[in-house]
Amino acid sequence: MKTERARGCEENYMKSESTAILLRIFIGESDHYKGKPLYMYIVEMLKAEGIAGATVFRGIAGFGKHSRIHTTSILRLSTDMPILIEVSDLEENIERIRPKLDEVINQGLITEEKVKIVFYDSDKNK
């Protein structure tokens, strides 16, 4: 991990860079596991496992394996919008949680890629 302190600024902030893995998990909004929406179950599981971060996005339109278009259009109310969960952390942490994802995802898609993380941390709001 590379870390540097900003120069010439009144605020004291740190910038650090590292290599990580970005997982993109594509599931449906109607997917559930143990009585709760699958996306919430996954986010709660990731947090409990100490994963660095995860964000859930709800798509406004999309199609998948069955080529059915899902949209938020008033004329075509869909109860199964596409859900994307982005997860980023160190490779060893992602590898550790992969089997847990395999257990809970019955239908969907996961993509994985190496990414460079640039993290900024400032004490100006503290």
Model-derived segments and spans:
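Positively charged, small/polar-rich N-terminal and surface patches that mediate targeting and assembly
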Residues: 2-126
